[in-house]
């Protein structure tokens, strides 16, 4: 498309979304559930065709030299599609929060004042790589009574088109407007610039992808932005802790899957347990091919681990989101230094402490400035599905409006409602 056509095309998407948003907002819980269950069924019925479309994206990605983590994020396996279907079903079974009134109270004047939860209206979603985000965003849009415009990465265009077609079918089956969820069908990057500059039609933009993408959108957008920044997640092994449990959790947090933003990228270890803990986790990482970039003190312990891939950490390593079998390792004096290190280098996504000390755990929960803070659990649990939110639109590292996994409530706002019986202000 030429520039003029891109402007006209995105404008039409905005107009159609705005019209559809009114009908989406009025939809009953039963109608929205019908659409979600239809989408779950269609996903299961179309696993093979979806994988055929996905294969074209994967072949193109490999030919274009995309990194292994990026290719992994592109892959639509039967397990990934089943998780998407289950997310739709979980959302369908959840209570509908739209229209609920909270905090209703009687005022001295006689009026009653409360707040009603309502859809945002239209949100734009810009994301890279993961085609399953198309389903996560669409299903949350349906459940929350919003319309949305989705712009996936060019590397996943065939997969996204196929998934968006299923969403349109599910909406039609439920009697909802097919324009309630729209996919930007062009890979022209100018479409992104137009989408983030349509305040008359788009109420909020949610970018999900690399740091460069999110910084660009945050800088150029003319509508509010809910940011999903990178995930430099930390696991801190405290003194005292259950060493066996700590080894198990630190292993899972790093090696369960390397490409998600909730994988741990930095391992902090209290000096008092380092000599016992590091050789055990080091042996596991070595066996799985994980490179350990450590401080001099940690390397002195890890050098005895057979087959260990070791390197001295640089200052940049403490801030790095690897999305790969690499982890930075640092020995700290204790919980004070761990908290200070995390608050300095973390991306404020998800950080965990593994400890037997209740006071250390409470301090960590209070003082670590991240969207999700965990005690004795893997950072890999930082996920809307695991948190019982159904699907998630992303994990916000912002402090306003939505923070952490953004589910249904993150796609709503509250308006004041006032109920009276003829009261007038004196």
Swiss-Prot record:
Biological process per Gene Ontology, one example term: L-proline biosynthetic process
A cellular component annotation (GO) from this entry: cytoplasm
A GO molecular-function annotation: glutamate-5-semialdehyde dehydrogenase activity
Pfam family, one: Aldedh
EC number: 1.2.1.41
Coiled-coil region: none
Domain of life: Bacteria
Gene3D superfamilies, A to Z: Aldehyde Dehydrogenase, Chain A, domain 1, Aldehyde Dehydrogenase, Chain A, domain 2
Catalytic function, reaction form: L-glutamate 5-semialdehyde + phosphate + NADP(+) = L-glutamyl 5-phosphate + NADPH + H(+)
Main subcellular location of this protein, as a coarse class: cytoplasm
Assigned keywords, A-Z: Amino-acid biosynthesis, Cytoplasm, NADP, Oxidoreductase, Proline biosynthesis
UniProt KW Amino-acid biosynthesis keyword: yes
The protein's annotated pathway: Amino-acid biosynthesis; L-proline biosynthesis; L-glutamate 5-semialdehyde from L-glutamate: step 2/2
Annotated compartments: Cytoplasm
Enzyme class: oxidoreductase
Family: Belongs to the gamma-glutamyl phosphate reductase family.
Its biological purpose: Catalyzes the NADPH-dependent reduction of L-glutamate 5-phosphate into L-glutamate 5-semialdehyde and phosphate. The product spontaneously undergoes cyclization to form 1-pyrroline-5-carboxylate.
Protein name stated in the entry: Gamma-glutamyl phosphate reductase
Origin species: Delftia acidovorans (strain DSM 14801 / SPH-1)
Higher taxonomy: Bacteria, Pseudomonadati, Pseudomonadota, Betaproteobacteria, Burkholderiales
């Amino acid at each position: 498309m030429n520039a003029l056509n891109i402007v006209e095309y995105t404008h039409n998407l905005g107009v159609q979304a705005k019209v559809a948003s009114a009908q989406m907002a009025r939809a009953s819980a039963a109608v929205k559930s019908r659409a979600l269950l239809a989408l779950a069924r269609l996903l299961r019925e179309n696993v093979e065709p979806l994988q055929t479309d996905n294969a074209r994206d994967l072949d193109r990605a490999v030919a274009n030299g995309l990194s292994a983590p990026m290719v992994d994020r592109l892959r639509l396996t039967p397990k990934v599609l089943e998780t998407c279907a289950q997310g739709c079903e979980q959302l369908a079974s959840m209570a509908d929060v739209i229209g609920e009134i909270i905090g209703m109270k009687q005022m001295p004047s006689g009026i009653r004042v409360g707040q009603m939860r309502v859809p945002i209206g239209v949100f734009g979603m810009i994301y890279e790589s993961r085609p399953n985000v198309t389903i996560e965003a669409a299903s949350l849009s349906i459940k929350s009574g919003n319309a949305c415009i989705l712009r996936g990465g060019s590397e996943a265009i065939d997969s996204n088109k196929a998934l968006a077609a299923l969403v349109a079918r599910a909406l039609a089956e439920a009697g909802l407007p097919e324009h309630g969820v729209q996919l930007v069908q062009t890979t022209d990057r100018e479409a992104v610039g137009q989408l983030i500059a349509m305040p008359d039609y788009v109420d909020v933009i949610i970018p999900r992808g690399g740091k460069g993408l999110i910084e660009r959108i945050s800088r150029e957008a003319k509508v509010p932005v809910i940011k999903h920044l990178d995930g430099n997640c930390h696991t801190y092994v405290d003194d005292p802790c259950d060493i066996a449990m700590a080894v198990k959790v630190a292993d899972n947090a790093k090696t369960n899957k390397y490409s998600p933003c909730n994988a741990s990228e930095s391992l902090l270890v209290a000096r008092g347990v380092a000599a016992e803990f590091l050789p055990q986790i080091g042996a596991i990482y070595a066996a799985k091919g994980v490179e350990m970039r450590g401080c001099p003190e940690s390397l002195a312990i890890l050098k005895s681990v057979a087959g260990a891939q070791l390197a001295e950490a640089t200052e940049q390593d403490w801030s790095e989101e690897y999305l790969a079998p690499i982890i930075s390792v640092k020995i700290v004096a204790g919980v004070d230094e761990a908290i200070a290190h995390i608050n300095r280098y973390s991306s404020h996504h998800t950080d965990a402490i593994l400890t037997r000390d209740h006071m250390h755990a409470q301090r960590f929960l209070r003082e670590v400035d991240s969207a999700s803070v965990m005690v004795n659990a893997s950072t890999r649990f930082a996920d809307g599905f695991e948190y019982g939110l159904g699907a998630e639109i992303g994990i916000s590292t912002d402090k306003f409006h939505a923070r952490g996994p953004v589910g249904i409530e993150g796609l709503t706002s509250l308006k004041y409602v006032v109920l009276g019986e003829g009261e007038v202000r004196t």
